[in-house]
Every structure is written in C-alpha cells, then in structure tokens.
C-alpha cells in the first residue's frame, strides 16, 4: 500500500509507517489513543498487552516504538473490531509481532501464564446513560462490560513487578481512577495532564501505574500554541507518527 494512495482513504487514518482502517470499529482513531500510544514508557519492555484493542492503533504504535524482539498481545471483545485490527496488523510491518485475540479480557487473562512489562488501555469511562447508536459503540464507551476495578485487577494479575500499566482518561475521571488504583495497591509513577492550549484547564490525563513503589513524575502537555499550531512538546511526542509533521 503506497502512501500516495493510502493518504486519501476515507475509512481510516494514515500514519507515517502504517494505516489504521476503523470504519468497522465503534471508536475511531483519535487524539486520546495517539497520545497514549506515543507517551507510554517502552524502555526495556519485552512483552506488551493492549486491553480493548479496537482498531489495533495502540498495538501498532507500540510495535513501531519497540525492538523487533518485543511481542504484543491485543485483546478485543467485539468481533468486527478484532477482525479489522487483525487486517490492519496484517498490512503493517509488524504482523509477526502482534497477536490479536477476540476474547473477553476477564476470561482471557485467567488462561495466561506470561507476564507483561507494559499493559496499556484506552478504556471505557462513561457510566450507563443515554443510549448509543449501536451496541458496539455502547460497549466501547460504557464501563458496563469492563468496569475500572475489573480493569485494574486484570492488569495486576498479568504485569511484571517493575512493569507499567498505562491509561488515558478525562481529567476528573482520571483522578477517581487514581484513587481507586492506589486503594488497590498500585503506585502512580507517571502523570501527564493534557490541555488543548495554555488558556484552558487540562481535559485529559495520561497515567502510568506500577506494582513497584517509586517516585512519581508529573508534568503538563499543551497540544496547541498561541498560533493554534501544534506545540513543540506535542510535536516532539507525536511526530514519529503523524504523516505531515
């Protein structure tokens, strides 16, 4: 697939090294996922787990950022999304390194014996409320099929002692998620609050937890500068992926 033909495809998102089709996925490629995939710490990792893989975006970003020896498991409950993730991965340079599993993570995790150095998730965060257009979108948006305590428990069952569990959430929900994680024995090690520009309050938060205690590093990321162009910090974080950066 050449860049000249793929850049104009309307059913997905073209990155520098791969294309993500998402027309059969409830949740499309967006800034949240791109932020998380570019931000999650990958130094020294040997095995990664993507919980709720959707289109396969995070798994593909991690594959681009890591050595050829790193293996990635991507677990997705919804069959159409999992099938599209598999197609996206098959067309990428890293098909041999990413395994897609169509499964409920709560059941899948009980069958695993390996431990992961990095567990990553762009999780649902809405409580049950206004109906979505499709059951698939409701599943992707609401915590009914995977609530936050269950997500934290799943990650705890399969992570290495020095590993990181990374999520992206709305700011206020992220604060509650952090309190819950700490009460369950996790340690917050990295936190980046994300604002659209300097004048606005943070609207998203990137969080990295570990079973191992240690210093917590916190910072703030502004997506756009005063001229409305991408900020230097956001560009530095994501330029390996965005096509025209």
From Swiss-Prot:
Enzyme class label: transferase
Record carries keyword DNA damage: no
UniProt-listed Enzyme Commission number(s): 2.1.1.223
InterPro entries in UniProt: DNA_methylase_N6_adenine_CS, SAM-dependent_MTases_sf, Small_mtfrase_dom, tRNA_Adenine-N(6)_MTase, tRNA_adenine-N6_MeTrfase
Catalytic activity as recorded in UniProt: adenosine(37) in tRNA1(Val) + S-adenosyl-L-methionine = N(6)-methyladenosine(37) in tRNA1(Val) + S-adenosyl-L-homocysteine + H(+)
Presence of keyword rRNA-binding: no
Record-level Gene Ontology MF annotations: nucleic acid binding; tRNA (adenine-N6)-methyltransferase activity
Transmembrane segments: none
Main location: cytoplasm
The entry's keywords: Cytoplasm, Methyltransferase, S-adenosyl-L-methionine, Transferase, tRNA processing
Cellular component, GO annotation: cytoplasm
Matching Pfam families: MTS (PF05175)
GO biological process: methylation; tRNA processing
Localization in the cell: Cytoplasm
Matching NCBIfam families: tRm6a37MtseTrmN
Task of the protein: Specifically methylates the adenine in position 37 of tRNA(1)(Val) (anticodon cmo5UAC).
Family affiliation: Belongs to the methyltransferase superfamily. tRNA (adenine-N(6)-)-methyltransferase family.
Protein name, UniProt field: tRNA1(Val) (adenine(37)-N6)-methyltransferase
Lineage, highest ranks first: Bacteria, Pseudomonadati, Pseudomonadota, Gammaproteobacteria, Enterobacterales
Gene name in the database record: yfiC
